[in-house]
Amino acid sequence: MSNDEKSSAMTISRRGLMLVLSSPSGAGKSTVSKALLEHDAQIIMSVSMTTRPMRPGEVDGKDYVFADQGIFDAMVKANEFLEHATVFENSYGTPKAPVEKTLSEGRDVLFDVDWQGTQELERIARDDLVSIFILPPSVEELERRLHGRVQDADDVVKKRMAKATSEMSHWNEYDYIIVNENVDESVARVEAILAAERLKRIRQSGMLDFVRGMGVSQ
């Protein structure tokens, strides 16, 4: 038997997990998410639907699915979202169908949602969910990062700082906490969490058959 055949024979099916990364705006969540997706082919980004205007450089269907309020409200009424919320007067939501398909195929889904979205996901999918909150190294550093965003005016920065304070008060509702002082270290920590969570017994859907195949009783 070749090495490839041995590797195939040792494959144990698993159910994918839902990995939530949350942080206040400017804490580095997007950078960490991008690196994780580049490093790991077994995880894909959940594409949320939003009613906010498209920003320069964004691609419809990749960064977000952009929709008008009427379409969004109809999907809410039809219970087609895993979670949805209103942020800065715009609606955001995660469609159910593509997420469930990915999990059933044994792949993981990365979510970029706030604490409200995380609570809703936890309510309906606790066994599938792993949540991580990313904190900035300091409030001063967070404000500096926000001011560095050309598209955000001073009044917008003030609003985001106020919201950041509120968001950070929910840090203790998450499974894991990472202080993002160094991006590479933060990415490595997320990868370590992901590796361990994938090995949890509850997610090893093919483990029972594997063990029985060795003549071990349940």
Regions found by a protein language model. Give the residues of each.
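Extreme N-terminal, non-catalytic leader segments
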Residues: 1-18, 41
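NTP-dependent small-molecule kinase module
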Residues: 2-6, 151-152, 166-218
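Residue-level preference for the first positions of well-ordered beta-strands
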Residues: 16-20, 108-110
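P-loop (Walker A) phosphate-binding loop of NTP-binding proteins
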Residues: 22-24
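ATP-binding Walker
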Residues: 27
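N-terminal phosphate/diphosphate-binding loop that engages ATP/GTP or pyrophosphate donors
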Residues: 31-80
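Hydrophobic/aromatic beta-strand patches that form the interior of the parallel beta-sheet core
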Residues: 46, 65, 130-132, 176-178
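ATP-dependent NMP and nucleoside kinases share a basic, alpha-helical "lid"
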Residues: 70-80, 94-150, 168
